[in-house]
Amino acid sequence: LGKEGYFAFNDGMTPENSCQCSACRRQYNPALPFEKQASGWAFRFVARYAEAIRAIWPDRRLATLAYQHYQAPPEGMRIPDNVDVTYVTKIVHYASDPDLFNQELEKVHAWSKLLNNKTERFGIWLNIVDPATYTSKVPFMYPNIFKRWLLATRDVTDSCFINGLNSRLNRSGEEGRLNAFSTYPMVWLQSRLLWNPEYSVDELLWDYIRNSFGPAADTMRRFHDLIISRWEGIPWSPETMDEIAFIHCVRYDEERVRELK
């Protein structure tokens, strides 16, 4: 066997789908922000599991996720030093608002501190499936946000993973697979920036467009510039409007749709 075991709660484990036994319910705190409601409960179990592993296999490590209502670091407890954590965020690509960007950074730095600032113990997973999977087929691109994120976090982690959409993923159905193609330009940019976050976004984008579209490159550059500016330059506030309405009434109003056409 390898030197690291993996444990994660079910991907769909939201508060209503978590264990409802009396012992577990006592450990939930629904009065806290969503990402903190079950952190103590989840990581107390992870800590016990890690110590049990250490007692039998002293050189083994336990890898786990910080996600959903246990995304924030637990307060007032120690994480065993044989535990590695991957922080899962679904909102970095929405972080054109500096406040939202900084809130995510604060959680990342809190986790790093709890793991004794060991970059090899801390990973970041950008879970980017919205809006293309569930909300809207409108293309979205966020290369400048992504670059800022990589530069801001490269001293606290030595790994960053991004899941996206796969045109061959059968569980998504035909419509879901077609949605995947609209994300490919951003997937390409992400791949290049992961290798070197110092790259110029403008130069990378032009390289992609020139090699992909040939004689239509100038037109497609204007198209992609508009997509980027409408995503990165207009923050969405969930408190004021649902995302579908925001995308189709604000981000892409009638004037912008005519411009894209």
Please provide the spans of the model-predicted regions.
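Catalytic-core regions of glycoside hydrolase
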Residues: 1-205, 212, 249-258
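Short coil/turn segments at secondary-structure boundaries
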Residues: 4-10, 220-225, 237-243
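Charge-rich, low-complexity amphipathic helices
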Residues: 75, 174-175, 230-234, 242
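Charged, amphipathic alpha-helical linkers/stalks
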Residues: 192-237
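Histidine-centered catalytic/metal-binding microenvironments
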Residues: 235-261
